[in-house]
Amino acid sequence: MTNQTVSPLFPHRHLLGIKGLSPLDILCLLDLAYQEIAVSRQPEKKKSVLRGRTQINLFFEASTRTQSSFELAGKRLGADVMNMSVGNSSVKKGETLIDTAMTLNAMQPDILVIRHASAGAAALLAQKVGCSVVNAGDGAHEHPTQALLDALTIRRAKGQIENLIVAICGDVLHSRVARSNILLLNALGARVRVVAPSTLLPAGMADMSVEVFNSMEEGLKDADVVMMLRLQRERMAGSFVPSVREYFHFYGLDREKLKFAKPDALVMHPGPMNRGVEIASDVADGPQSVIQQQVEMGVAVRMAVMEALLDPRRNPGNGEPA
């Protein structure tokens, strides 16, 4: 990876997942996101690259931070941004996702950002509309921009991703964040571990090129990055953990468990956090935490994704307005 030249061109119409992206595609987005950071830190946080373009955010699942991040990203690029409130939409009256897609397509948007509880919803939408589609999370399938912002955060702090030991800990079973991160980190040459109780591990982990641990002590040993996952109790249909208190005792990241990792290990969390469940407050707010940097990198990455998809200089085959 280190000797390959990264092209400024992004040869995709949609961003539906990390799966399907080459390592060079990923690096293209990360390199562009570096440039977007500078824009966000200027007094006038604005570019005109997407002036005249229309972005519709279609969130079937509530997510204040992700939706706000996409909205801010679009506005900083100069796009006209519309947030569609699903709670007040025809979806609540029985309209299907395909019906919604056809209706939105008739409005001639340039890009649709969708979050949905069903895996594959973004891919289905992409088949039905004439504009670009960005997956902001579909069920337990993927969350590509979260993985990209995590990679950007790691790369800025550590200078590289290749050969780093990254431990992903917690509710892996229900986590689209874990899946996308595993795909991306493997693509860029990291050594990926997952740490979780057996009840929170999906089948087939061995096929994803990761090391699996049921012990935090073993899984965090010499880790460069500790990525905690939220315990997603709203997605749990059965009894996956005996109690929240017991879960924190064995799998919550506190100062004592963090000592198993390298002294300069990064602490990450995609948010929202359950303090005292998967992570202790003094660790979340401690000197090794880069959780707030992840939020900042999220805006930069989403700016990069939309610019890569819609700017004709970066995507000649997909750069004309819809």
Curated annotation (Swiss-Prot):
GO terms for molecular function: amino acid binding; aspartate carbamoyltransferase activity. It comes from the Bacteria. Keywords: Pyrimidine biosynthesis, Transferase. GO terms for cellular component: cytosol. InterPro entries: Asp/Orn_carbamoyltranf_P-bd, Asp/Orn_carbamoylTrfase, Asp/Orn_carbamoylTrfase_sf, Asp_carbamoyltransf, Asp_carbamoyltransf_Asp/Orn-bd. Its EC number is 2.1.3.2. Pathway: Pyrimidine metabolism; UMP biosynthesis via de novo pathway; (S)-dihydroorotate from bicarbonate: step 2/3. L-aspartate binds at residues 93, 176, 230. Carbamoyl phosphate binds at residues 65-66, 115, 143, 146, 271-272. GO terms for biological process: 'de novo' pyrimidine nucleobase biosynthetic process; 'de novo' UMP biosynthetic process; amino acid metabolic process. The keyword Transferase applies. Gene3D superfamilies: Aspartate/ornithine carbamoyltransferase. It catalyses: carbamoyl phosphate + L-aspartate = N-carbamoyl-L-aspartate + phosphate + H(+). SUPFAM superfamilies: Aspartate/ornithine carbamoyltransferase. Heterododecamer (2C3:3R2) of six catalytic PyrB chains organized as two trimers (C3), and six regulatory PyrI chains organized as three dimers (R2). Catalyzes the condensation of carbamoyl phosphate and aspartate to form carbamoyl aspartate and inorganic phosphate, the committed step in the de novo pyrimidine nucleotide biosynthesis pathway. NCBIfam families: asp_carb_tr, PRK00856.1. Belongs to the aspartate/ornithine carbamoyltransferase superfamily. ATCase family. This is Aspartate carbamoyltransferase catalytic subunit. It comes from Brucella canis (strain ATCC 23365 / NCTC 10854 / RM-666).
